[in-house]
């Protein structure tokens, strides 16, 4: 099984790229979805997060309020590191389980989509790193529109992540997503045809 590690900055278009790859025949494992599973009430990660950040980050049903937690971790790098020390091992374990299931089922191409693939040291579990690249201004505009954030809040979130240029330098494949959706789809189809003829 070929495993593509799909990464990119916030609002770079990773989900759009993953949908195109699914259409081409890949099976996608989304680290964000695994993160939601890993911190569900009753899990050890959930208990550790509440112990680290307090009950003020909980919704009435006991689930983690991602927006409240996000406002803490994007404002404080030590808080972000504390959260990542809790969540990354739990996400890694879930990803390994999913990848093992896919290997057993004979899936030819899997995509592990993770915004922090490189930062979390997860590149060793993939065969190739594909980076979805957009320029910073496009990223800021997309984050503001998608998440309803102010420019300064969007800039703060971008500052908390590895710069796009550094991420792109670590990828075996860089997918430019500054153009139209049609251009993006065409680029991915060309890359796919070369990689998986």
UniProtKB/Swiss-Prot annotation:
Signal peptide bounds: none
Location relative to the cell: Cytoplasm
Lineage summary: Bacteria, Pseudomonadati, Thermodesulfobacteriota, Desulfuromonadia, Geobacterales
Keyword terms: ATP-binding, Coenzyme A biosynthesis, Cytoplasm, Kinase, Nucleotide-binding, Transferase
Broad class of enzyme this protein falls into: transferase
Organism field: Geobacter sulfurreducens (strain ATCC 51573 / DSM 12127 / PCA)
Gene Ontology, cellular component aspect: cytoplasm
Pathway: Cofactor biosynthesis; coenzyme A biosynthesis; CoA from (R)-pantothenate: step 5/5
Functional description taken from the UniProt entry: Catalyzes the phosphorylation of the 3'-hydroxyl group of dephosphocoenzyme A to form coenzyme A.
Domain of life (superkingdom): Bacteria
Name of this protein: Dephospho-CoA kinase
Gene: coaE
UniProt catalytic activity: 3'-dephospho-CoA + ATP = ADP + CoA + H(+)
